[in-house]
Amino acid sequence: MKNPIKFLFSSEESDTKVANNRLLSYAIGLAGQNMNYNFVSQRLFVFLNAVMGIKPEKTGWITSVSTLWDAVNDPIIGTLIDSRKFKPGRKLRPFLLYLPPLIGVLTALMFFDFGMNETQTIVMVVAVYLMVDIFYSVQDVALWGMLPLSSPHSEERARVSQWVAIGAGAGASIAGLFPTIKDMIINSGLATEKNAYFIGAAVFGFGGMIISMLAYRMKEKVYTQAEERESVLKTLSTLRYNKTLIIICLARLLGGITLTLPWEYFFESQGISYHVFGLELTGGTMQVLYGLIPGIPGAFAMFFAAKFANRIGGMKKVLVISEIGQILIRTVAFFLGSNDRFLNGGILISIMVLISIMNIPINMKDIAHRSLISDSIDEVELKTGERTEGISFSMQNFISKLTSAESKFIQGYLLKFLKFDNNVKRPAGKNPIGYQTGRFLKYRWHQFMLGPVVGSILYLIVILFLDDDREHMAEVERQLKLKREAEQPQEEAFEMIEAES
């Protein structure tokens, strides 16, 4: 058995193989970035609505409009990155070093209570969000765009995709600890709820961005350079040659149409406490456990995603299996926990076991998306002579943020439909989630367990049209290798990249 320490810190590399120590730094960098992203995406809506007291529909508009701007900004940034002049090995790496500290500071400011009224708070949050978005978009496109540049070979890129997905998932899980940390801070009297959110933003937002700087150690191993600026419109027009990217983007966009709320609105509703193995757990603690424990099998399975995909016949089948599994398992879990049976410890554990099984292929989805898109960039290069890391991965970011925006928009009106009252009578200093009645409580389990099924059905319909032919991809690699060798010998190209790095 290999020594895991030697394996992770191995510096062995070639023109096609990524050194494990660089891959580890890249994965940790993605973990840091996802700490920031997940804290903001999961907590900003709740912070503005339940903590700062902004009305649900206004909160929905703030977060959805801000995220829409964020989404539209990404393709512009990606196109500009692809069309600019750069030297070999320096297309994306510089952005990974200089932008994170600024992004981290701006993130923390979004969660600071300046003591302003509702209108002033809305203006401040939107203004800061728009500023942070520009810098975040550049860094985000550069981080993920490094994946197709990591190696000219599909199998090695799949390995890189697998490890960075593990890093990203780890970062999201770390950020998911916030509810428990928040409860501990508040219950110990160390800070108010507002200040607890600011502490979270400082730790996960700013701290995560500092950690993300480690990704700068990754190298660009696919020889590419632009001695002259390309037309922005020409760069953007290459998207029409990328059928894989278009199908994945459409599937993800439709998959974001879910009738569900952030987890806090379920786990903290009506001051619920959960009785498990004789222990009484708070809603915040149960939320962390529900995210952490069922996520363990899926996190472990990510280490074998590439092998699993090869065994079943490709990454497309991973995507299909993940959605069918989610539809079936969520439906079974809904009936198992209906009529408030989810409050029973034994029932809840059974549901968590089902969700654990569901999460195994679900956690492989992002690996499959990125692996397929990295391969599609090679296909576009063969057709057009242009490499499109910037625009291709900015489109993925665009869709991520567009789906987030549509989700936030739906959440605002779903709260209104459920008659959520953020002025409900409650003890001083307590957020209103735990004191709701009526329709909100009646449908809390429906929205939590069945809401995501709507998006899964829509996603599955579209993804069935995706092509994933391994023999065709091998031929693309062969032709590209001949093309690159004709333009510049691979050894010489690699030496240039090494020197520039």
Indicate where each model-derived feature is located:
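Membrane-embedded alpha-helical bundles of multi-pass transporters/translocases
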Residues: 2-500
